[in-house]
Regions:
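Long, contiguous binding/interaction regions
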Residues: 2-28, 32-34, 66
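A general marker of short, structured functional hotspots
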Residues: 6-8, 30, 44, 55, ...
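Generic structural motif
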Residues: 13-15, 53, 84-86
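Intrinsic-disorder-associated interaction segments
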Residues: 24, 52-55, 80
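Short, intrinsically disordered low-complexity segments
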Residues: 36-75
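Short, mixed-charge low-complexity intrinsically disordered segments
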Residues: 61-97
Length: 102
């Protein structure tokens, strides 16, 4: 049986970061500030983990708020949510929701 996890991973596109005048750390620091307030641990660069499998609210907040920022969707390359034994591509899910709600 696989170990259940609650984790979110962010990978930014270096070329898009340069074009927008941002750095990876600037982007991650915005996420880190929120994550640390909500008991999420950065287990490696850009990977945030919750030791409490019931602590999904911070992840839902990130999913709802980051795409609405002026910068996030322009520079994100990979955005993955590992919830228990499932893996969700948050970029694909976001664009699917946008298409459905258009």
């Amino acid at each position: 049986m696989e170990q259940e996890i609650l984790r979110m991973k962010f990978v930014f596109d270096e070329n898009k970061l340069k074009a927008s005048g941002m750095t990876e750390d600037e982007c991650l620091n915005i996420i880190r500030k929120y994550a640390f307030k909500h008991n999420l641990t950065e287990i490696e660069k850009g990977v945030f983990d919750s030791s409490d499998l019931d602590n999904t609210d911070p992840f839902f907040y990130i999913i709802m708020k980051l795409p609405d920022s002026k910068w996030f969707m322009k520079v994100i390359k990979e955005w993955t949510w590992y919830i228990e034994n499932d893996i969700e591509d948050c970029i694909a899910a976001y664009y699917n929701a946008v298409i459905k709600n258009a």
